[in-house]
Protein backbone atom coordinates (compact mmCIF):
# COMPACT_ATOMS: atom_id res chain seq x y z
CA UNK A 1 0.00 0.00 0.00
CA UNK A 2 1.09 3.58 -0.63
CA UNK A 3 3.25 5.14 2.05
CA UNK A 4 4.36 1.89 3.70
CA UNK A 5 8.09 1.52 4.04
CA UNK A 6 7.96 -2.12 5.17
CA UNK A 7 6.47 -5.16 3.51
CA UNK A 8 2.78 -6.01 3.61
CA UNK A 9 3.61 -8.97 5.85
CA UNK A 10 5.34 -6.74 8.41
CA UNK A 11 2.38 -4.36 8.39
CA UNK A 12 -0.13 -7.15 9.05
CA UNK A 13 2.02 -8.68 11.79
CA UNK A 14 2.08 -5.34 13.58
CA UNK A 15 -1.66 -4.86 13.10
CA UNK A 16 -2.49 -8.30 14.49
CA UNK A 17 -0.23 -7.75 17.49
CA UNK A 18 -2.18 -4.58 18.31
CA UNK A 19 -5.50 -6.41 17.92
CA UNK A 20 -4.27 -9.18 20.21
CA UNK A 21 -3.43 -6.66 22.93
CA UNK A 22 -6.94 -5.21 22.65
CA UNK A 23 -8.39 -8.71 22.96
CA UNK A 24 -6.43 -9.21 26.19
CA UNK A 25 -7.65 -5.86 27.52
CA UNK A 26 -11.25 -6.79 26.74
CA UNK A 27 -10.87 -10.16 28.50
CA UNK A 28 -9.56 -8.43 31.63
CA UNK A 29 -12.74 -6.34 31.92
CA UNK A 30 -15.11 -9.22 31.15
CA UNK A 31 -17.28 -11.10 33.63
CA UNK A 32 -15.81 -14.50 32.79
CA UNK A 33 -14.62 -17.33 35.03
CA UNK A 34 -11.11 -18.67 34.78
CA UNK A 35 -10.47 -22.08 33.25
CA UNK A 36 -7.45 -24.12 34.33
CA UNK A 37 -7.34 -25.96 31.03
CA UNK A 38 -6.19 -29.45 30.12
CA UNK A 39 -5.11 -31.46 27.10
CA UNK A 40 -8.33 -30.66 25.24
CA UNK A 41 -9.45 -27.34 26.78
CA UNK A 42 -7.64 -24.04 26.44
CA UNK A 43 -6.77 -22.07 29.55
CA UNK A 44 -8.74 -18.89 30.17
CA UNK A 45 -8.12 -15.98 32.53
CA UNK A 46 -10.75 -14.87 35.02
CA UNK A 47 -11.97 -11.34 34.29
CA UNK A 48 -12.25 -8.61 36.92
CA UNK A 49 -15.99 -9.14 37.19
CA UNK A 50 -15.38 -12.68 38.45
CA UNK A 51 -12.84 -11.52 41.04
CA UNK A 52 -14.47 -8.68 42.94
CA UNK A 53 -16.78 -9.35 45.88
CA UNK A 54 -15.45 -7.46 48.93
CA UNK A 55 -16.08 -3.86 47.86
CA UNK A 56 -18.98 -3.91 45.44
CA UNK A 57 -22.35 -2.38 44.73
CA UNK A 58 -24.88 -4.39 42.74
CA UNK A 59 -28.66 -4.57 42.48
CA UNK A 60 -29.69 -7.13 45.10
CA UNK A 61 -33.33 -6.33 44.39
CA UNK A 62 -32.80 -7.35 40.79
CA UNK A 63 -31.12 -10.73 41.40
CA UNK A 64 -27.56 -9.39 41.22
CA UNK A 65 -24.93 -11.32 43.17
CA UNK A 66 -21.20 -11.45 43.77
CA UNK A 67 -19.06 -14.38 42.60
CA UNK A 68 -19.29 -17.40 44.89
CA UNK A 69 -16.65 -19.65 46.41
CA UNK A 70 -13.26 -18.99 47.96
CA UNK A 71 -11.17 -19.15 44.78
CA UNK A 72 -10.83 -15.79 43.05
CA UNK A 73 -12.00 -15.64 39.46
CA UNK A 74 -13.51 -19.12 39.58
CA UNK A 75 -17.15 -18.10 39.05
CA UNK A 76 -18.70 -15.14 37.21
CA UNK A 77 -20.88 -12.67 39.04
CA UNK A 78 -24.64 -12.75 38.49
CA UNK A 79 -25.91 -9.77 36.54
CA UNK A 80 -28.85 -7.97 38.14
CA UNK A 81 -31.46 -5.51 36.95
CA UNK A 82 -29.68 -2.40 35.78
CA UNK A 83 -29.90 0.98 37.57
CA UNK A 84 -28.36 4.38 36.87
CA UNK A 85 -24.90 5.29 38.16
CA UNK A 86 -25.12 7.83 40.98
CA UNK A 87 -22.58 9.64 43.08
CA UNK A 88 -23.93 7.88 46.17
CA UNK A 89 -23.27 4.44 44.65
CA UNK A 90 -19.75 5.44 43.65
CA UNK A 91 -18.82 7.08 46.96
CA UNK A 92 -20.14 4.09 48.90
CA UNK A 93 -17.76 1.72 47.10
CA UNK A 94 -14.87 4.17 47.47
CA UNK A 95 -15.50 4.16 51.23
CA UNK A 96 -15.72 0.35 51.36
CA UNK A 97 -12.42 0.07 49.48
CA UNK A 98 -10.68 2.49 51.85
CA UNK A 99 -12.02 0.67 54.92
CA UNK A 100 -10.67 -2.60 53.47
CA UNK A 101 -7.19 -1.09 53.22
CA UNK A 102 -7.23 -0.04 49.58
CA UNK A 103 -5.74 3.14 48.15
CA UNK A 104 -7.50 3.37 44.77
CA UNK A 105 -5.94 5.62 42.16
CA UNK A 106 -8.02 5.07 39.01
CA UNK A 107 -11.55 4.42 37.81
CA UNK A 108 -12.21 2.49 34.58
CA UNK A 109 -15.58 3.05 32.94
CA UNK A 110 -17.34 3.36 29.61
CA UNK A 111 -18.04 6.59 27.75
CA UNK A 112 -21.69 6.42 28.82
CA UNK A 113 -20.79 6.13 32.51
CA UNK A 114 -18.19 8.89 32.14
CA UNK A 115 -20.97 11.23 31.03
CA UNK A 116 -22.96 10.20 34.10
CA UNK A 117 -19.98 10.95 36.34
CA UNK A 118 -19.70 14.45 34.90
CA UNK A 119 -22.93 15.28 36.73
CA UNK A 120 -21.50 14.43 40.16
CA UNK A 121 -21.85 17.36 42.55
CA UNK A 122 -18.64 19.02 43.64
CA UNK A 123 -17.23 18.93 40.13
CA UNK A 124 -16.65 22.68 40.20
CA UNK A 125 -14.43 22.61 37.16
CA UNK A 126 -16.86 20.64 35.06
CA UNK A 127 -17.62 23.61 32.85
CA UNK A 128 -15.07 26.34 32.61
CA UNK A 129 -13.93 28.67 29.90
CA UNK A 130 -10.86 27.47 28.03
CA UNK A 131 -9.34 29.21 25.05
CA UNK A 132 -11.50 31.67 23.18
CA UNK A 133 -14.36 29.84 21.50
CA UNK A 134 -14.06 26.63 23.54
CA UNK A 135 -15.83 25.17 26.55
CA UNK A 136 -14.14 22.60 28.79
CA UNK A 137 -16.52 19.86 29.96
CA UNK A 138 -14.10 17.43 31.54
CA UNK A 139 -13.36 15.78 34.87
CA UNK A 140 -10.00 14.02 34.97
CA UNK A 141 -9.59 13.74 38.75
CA UNK A 142 -12.17 13.11 41.47
CA UNK A 143 -11.32 13.74 45.12
CA UNK A 144 -13.11 12.04 48.01
CA UNK A 145 -12.32 11.70 51.73
CA UNK A 146 -11.10 8.17 50.83
CA UNK A 147 -8.68 9.09 48.09
CA UNK A 148 -8.12 10.81 44.77
CA UNK A 149 -8.80 8.87 41.58
CA UNK A 150 -8.17 9.50 37.90
CA UNK A 151 -10.99 8.75 35.47
CA UNK A 152 -9.98 6.38 32.66
CA UNK A 153 -12.67 5.98 29.98
CA UNK A 154 -12.09 2.57 28.40
CA UNK A 155 -13.58 1.22 25.16
CA UNK A 156 -13.09 -2.38 26.30
CA UNK A 157 -14.85 -1.93 29.66
CA UNK A 158 -18.34 -3.46 29.84
CA UNK A 159 -20.60 -0.42 30.01
CA UNK A 160 -22.68 -1.91 32.85
CA UNK A 161 -19.57 -2.17 35.07
CA UNK A 162 -17.37 0.47 36.72
CA UNK A 163 -14.07 -0.52 38.32
CA UNK A 164 -12.21 1.29 41.11
CA UNK A 165 -8.59 0.23 40.85
CA UNK A 166 -5.36 0.41 42.82
CA UNK A 167 -2.84 -0.27 40.06
CA UNK A 168 -0.21 -1.77 42.38
CA UNK A 169 -2.65 -4.52 43.29
CA UNK A 170 -3.12 -5.73 39.71
CA UNK A 171 -0.69 -7.11 37.15
CA UNK A 172 -0.67 -8.82 33.77
CA UNK A 173 1.34 -12.01 34.20
CA UNK A 174 2.98 -13.36 31.05
CA UNK A 175 2.76 -17.13 30.64
CA UNK A 176 4.08 -17.12 27.08
CA UNK A 177 5.74 -13.98 25.65
CA UNK A 178 4.44 -12.71 22.32
CA UNK A 179 6.13 -14.67 19.55
CA UNK A 180 5.97 -14.37 15.78
CA UNK A 181 6.23 -17.83 14.23
CA UNK A 182 6.46 -18.92 10.60
CA UNK A 183 3.99 -21.56 9.40
CA UNK A 184 4.16 -23.85 6.39
CA UNK A 185 3.90 -22.12 3.01
CA UNK A 186 1.09 -22.79 0.56
CA UNK A 187 2.61 -22.32 -2.85
CA UNK A 188 3.96 -18.77 -2.84
CA UNK A 189 1.79 -17.78 0.11
CA UNK A 190 3.57 -17.17 3.40
CA UNK A 191 1.76 -17.73 6.68
CA UNK A 192 2.69 -16.62 10.18
CA UNK A 193 1.07 -16.76 13.59
CA UNK A 194 1.45 -14.48 16.59
CA UNK A 195 1.21 -16.42 19.83
CA UNK A 196 1.12 -15.07 23.37
CA UNK A 197 -0.53 -15.94 26.66
CA UNK A 198 -1.23 -13.56 29.51
CA UNK A 199 -3.40 -13.75 32.58
CA UNK A 200 -4.78 -11.32 35.13
CA UNK A 201 -2.99 -11.36 38.48
CA UNK A 202 -5.02 -9.91 41.36
CA UNK A 203 -2.63 -9.24 44.24
CA UNK A 204 -5.22 -7.90 46.68
CA UNK A 205 -8.91 -8.24 45.84
CA UNK A 206 -9.85 -6.20 48.93
CA UNK A 207 -7.96 -3.18 47.53
CA UNK A 208 -10.26 -3.01 44.49
CA UNK A 209 -13.90 -2.04 44.03
CA UNK A 210 -16.69 -2.23 41.52
CA UNK A 211 -20.10 -0.71 40.83
CA UNK A 212 -22.17 -3.17 38.81
CA UNK A 213 -25.58 -3.51 37.16
CA UNK A 214 -25.51 -0.01 35.65
CA UNK A 215 -27.81 1.21 32.90
CA UNK A 216 -26.09 1.69 29.56
CA UNK A 217 -28.51 3.94 27.70
Residue ranges and their predicted role:
Residues 1-217:
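Core alpha/beta structural scaffold of self-assembling particle/tube/pore-forming proteins
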